[in-house]
Amino acid sequence: MTTKKTQALHALLRQVMEQHIAFNKHLGLKVESFDPAAPRLRFDMRPELVGNPKRQILHGGVISATLDVVGGLAIMLSLAEEMDGTPETFPNIGTIDLRVDYLRPGRGKYFIATGRIVRKGSRIAVIHMEMHNDQGELIATGGAAYVVG
């Protein structure tokens, strides 16, 4: 894919991920890296994302949703490389299974989620995701299967 085409695709994906998907916008998700091997999302801790007011920790649903989004982004970037970055030809992507392991309380000023493709076949992709806080502590891991097509 040419640099100009890559930049245009990244701008489009950023716009879709950050502005057009209302829930992503509500969570404050920002794309930090379009690296196909390890895309990265970031969001800041805010009062409306707290799941336990007494302990002031991140809601588990925010963690799982963010891991799901970064998994989907990993697939989109992989498909972009295969399809020469033409979004119109992208197949539909849907989560068919998502597992999250909550390893530590979601404390931090901000959080980073990354995704890595474990296996991608003609119809199913398997992704491993991780979420770290601003101190670099691993707070959750996820594994997901997505239908592609």
What spans do the regions from the language model cover?
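Extreme N-terminal tail/first-helix region
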Residues: 1-21
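HotDog/MaoC-like acyl-thioester-processing domains
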Residues: 3-7, 76, 105-149
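N-terminal structural module
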Residues: 14-39
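Residue-level preference for beta-strand/loop junctions
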Residues: 23, 37, 92-94, 109, ...
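Short structured motifs
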Residues: 25-31, 97-101, 113, 142
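Catalytic strand-loop segment that frames the active site of acyl-thioester-processing enzymes
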Residues: 30-58
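Hot-dog-fold acyl-thioester-processing enzymes
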Residues: 49-74
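Hydrophobic beta-strand-centered segment that forms part of the acyl-chain substrate-binding groove
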Residues: 74-112, 117
